[in-house]
């Protein structure tokens, strides 16, 4: 007969017709020296016959920065919160791919010890999805996330409209229209003379009315939103 010792869990052997066959699927990782020991009335081989089975581990990847940092929404030209990942197990490294492209101002940096970081200040707006792929000899999992960069608000006078009309008291002003762009939720207008008001609908501010007082009235349009407003407004 013959026996085999030192095999990893999940690996076994058979002995038939003078042949030892070692086979199976290891369920643990590590280095496993094994020894084949014939059973019989005479001496066994010295040194023993055997070999070594090396089982590599699957790679793992985990977010090590705060929960939620892997999916961020930031205003353009604003520093993002660092996004950190750790590759462990049998992983040897990581690469990153962006769709549709890496946002300008954002970098992917190895920190040592299989730690990796996404950081920087995006200078373009849009939605940017990323996939981090681990490297290694066995199963290579991935991690995904996204960075949504919202643009600053913009205010543009509608072509053909006069931003600085001159009218007589108690006479209607020509409508003044402004288009809002970028990121905004509302808008206000301050400084208008009595009798003149504004509406905001569909991203358009319309100033209209009949002034009932005379004078010079500088007015300011102020978009409301999460990002920067135009300076000067």
Q: Which residues are covered by each model-predicted region?
A:
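Extracellular acidic loop/turn motifs
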Residues: 1-2, 88-95, 180-188
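Low-complexity "stalk/linker" and mucin-like segments enriched in Ser/Thr/Pro/Ala/Gly
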Residues: 3-19, 95-116, 188-205
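Extracellular/luminal low-complexity segments enriched in Ser/Thr/Pro
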Residues: 21-29, 117-125, 205-214
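Proline-enriched interdomain boundary motifs that mark the N-terminal boundary
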Residues: 58-69, 152-161
């Amino acid at each position: 007969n013959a026996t085999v010792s030192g095999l990893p869990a999940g690996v076994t052997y058979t002995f038939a017709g003078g042949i030892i066959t070692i086979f199976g699927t290891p369920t643990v990782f590590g280095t496993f020296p094994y020894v084949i020991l014939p059973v019989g009335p005479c001496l066994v081989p010295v040194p023993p016959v055997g070999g070594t089975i090396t089982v590599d581990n699957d790679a793992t990847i985990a977010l090590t920065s705060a929960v939620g940092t892997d999916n961020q929404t930031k205003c353009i030209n604003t520093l993002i919160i660092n996004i950190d990942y750790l590759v462990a197990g049998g992983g040897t490294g990581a690469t990153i791919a962006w769709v549709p492209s890496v946002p300008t101002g954002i970098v992917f940096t190895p920190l040592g010890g299989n730690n990796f970081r996404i950081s920087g200040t995006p200078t373009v707006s849009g939605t940017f999805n990323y996939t981090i792929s681990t490297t290694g000899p066995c199963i290579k999992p991935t991690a995904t996330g996204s960075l949504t960069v919202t643009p600053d608000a913009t205010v543009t006078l509608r072509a053909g409209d006069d931003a600085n009309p001159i009218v007589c008291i108690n006479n209607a002003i020509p409508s003044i229209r402004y288009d809002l762009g970028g990121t905004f939720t509302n808008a206000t207008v301050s400084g208008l003379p009595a009798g003149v008001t504004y509406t905001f609908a569909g991203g358009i501010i319309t100033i209209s009315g009949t002034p009932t007082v005379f004078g010079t009235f500088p007015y300011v349009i102020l978009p409301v939103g999460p990002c920067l407003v135009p300076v000067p407004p």
